[in-house]
Every structure is written in C-alpha cells, then in structure tokens.
C-alpha cells in the first residue's frame, strides 16, 4: 500500500567510481611454439597437471626435450603423441595460477578518470559476501582499447585466470554531503517543504549511495522536508 513519507535530508559519504567487468589473468603464462615441422615422440605432462620449473614437457623426433620455464599448470595441450607440429603453431600452454592480476577495458571517457594507485573494489558473482580489494597498477592503450591493470591484494584460491569479476574503481570520495532518498525523485524533480511552503524543485544529481543520492550545490537545505509517495 502506498503511503506519503516525509523525511529530512541526511549527511553522509559518497564514492564516485567507474564500474566495469574485468578478467583475471595470470602474471606468468607461456605458449610453446616450434620453428620447424616436428613430430611429438612423447608427452611428459597432461592438461591440468602442475609442474615444477625445468620439468620435462615433451620430447620431439629430433631428440629435443622441452622443459617448463617456471612452475605452473598445463592449461592446454594442442597435440597428441605421434602428431606432426607445423612451425609457429601453439603446442602447449603453461600458466602460473598463483600469481594473477585483473584486466579491465574502458571507454575513453572513463579511462580519462583513471590514475595509478586508485583503490578498486572487486566482486565475484559466486562469492558476493567476500570484500576483495585491489589497486590500479597501470593504464595503457592496446588495439584501440584502453586497458587497466589491477593488482588484487589477495584472491581466494578458487579464483582462476579467465574468470570474470565486477570492478569498481574509486575516482573520488566525498564526505558530509547532502543525501536524499532516490525514491523521492520524479522526472528530475523533488517535492519539498521549506519554511511551511510546499515547493517542487528541479535538481541535479550527484553520486549514488545505496538508496540515497547526493544533491550537490546547496539545492536542498538541511532543514528541508522531503515529501514523496513510498511504494
């Protein structure tokens, strides 16, 4: 049942942020490619297997054994034993799952607001209850995109490279600002009682803070009474 609500504005804090979907990436990844037609004589590893640095990966018909350049996990084997590998084609992929970062792609307008060391809030769909944080490491152009590299403080062990994450990059935090309920705003206007007089005023909105929104520039006074229909 709808009811008329009257409430005074409150003071609070708001955070202006850039929101984007990011992807977890490994700090160390390696793709083995060969430079000549070669037959795989033997595989020493399988997909999903953890290997140590310098562990043997595969043996070719030239008698060459290729080894792991670092400790990690085999994430892809593209060929089986006895198959011929053509030059420059990926043979296997090795990834360090323990050291990761996050890559976010932004449009130009959002990218202009990003600076190194800005705080970032991270949220994974399956573990929304966990508060995860990071910082902006760098921003750079790549292939017509503007990419942001985020270094997380820590990530749960179940988070793997190529998983997606919601990111909120903190641009600015403002304290002691005037906030009014979002529900009180209709078509960019709000109805107020000011010194025993009812008024409907057009307002400019600032940042959101849950169900409240910032009203900058003194448009709403602390003693105003906000009148609206609560559904």
Model feature map: region roles:
Residues 124-126, 130-176, 211:
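Structural microfeature recognizing short secondary-structure transition sites
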Residues 117-125, 167-169, 188-194:
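Short conserved beta-strand and strand-loop elements enriched in small hydrophobics
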Residues 1-38, 44:
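N-terminal beta-strand block that forms a small beta-sandwich/beta-barrel module immediately after a flexible targeting
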Residues 151-155, 176-178, 189-231:
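Acidic- and glycine-rich mobile interface elements
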Residues 25-29, 35-38, 45-47, 55, ...:
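Periplasm/extracytoplasmic soluble domains of Gram-negative envelope assemblies
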Residues 9, 22-24, 40, 74, ...:
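Conserved hydrophobic positions within beta-strands
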Residues 2-4, 15-19, 66-69, 124-133, ...:
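Short coil-to-beta-strand transition motifs
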């Amino acid at each position: 049942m709808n009811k008329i609500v009257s409430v005074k504005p409150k003071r609070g804090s708001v955070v202006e942020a850039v929101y984007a979907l990011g992807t977890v990436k490994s700090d160390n990844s390696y793709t083995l490619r060969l430079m000549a037609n070669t037959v795989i004589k033997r595989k020493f590893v399988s997909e999903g297997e953890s290997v140590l640095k310098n562990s043997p990966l595969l043996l070719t018909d030239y008698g060459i054994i290729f080894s792991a350049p670092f400790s990690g996990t085999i994430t892809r084997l593209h060929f089986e034993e006895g198959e011929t590998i053509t030059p420059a084609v990926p043979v296997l992929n090795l990834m360090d799952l323990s050291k990761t970062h996050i890559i976010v792609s932004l449009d130009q307008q959002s990218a202009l607001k990003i600076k190194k060391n800005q705080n970032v809030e991270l949220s994974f769909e399956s573990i929304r209850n966990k508060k995860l944080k990071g910082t902006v490491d760098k921003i750079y152009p790549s292939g017509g995109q503007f990419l942001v590299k985020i270094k997380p403080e820590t990530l749960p062990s179940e988070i793997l490279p190529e998983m997606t994450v919601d990111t909120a990059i903190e641009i600015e935090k403002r304290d002691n600002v005037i906030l009014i309920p979002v529900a009180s705003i209709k078509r960019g206007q709000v109805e107020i009682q000011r010194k025993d007089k009812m008024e409907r005023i057009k307002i400019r909105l600032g940042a959101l803070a849950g169900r409240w929104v910032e009203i900058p520039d003194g448009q709403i006074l602390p003693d105003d009474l906000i009148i609206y229909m609560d559904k």
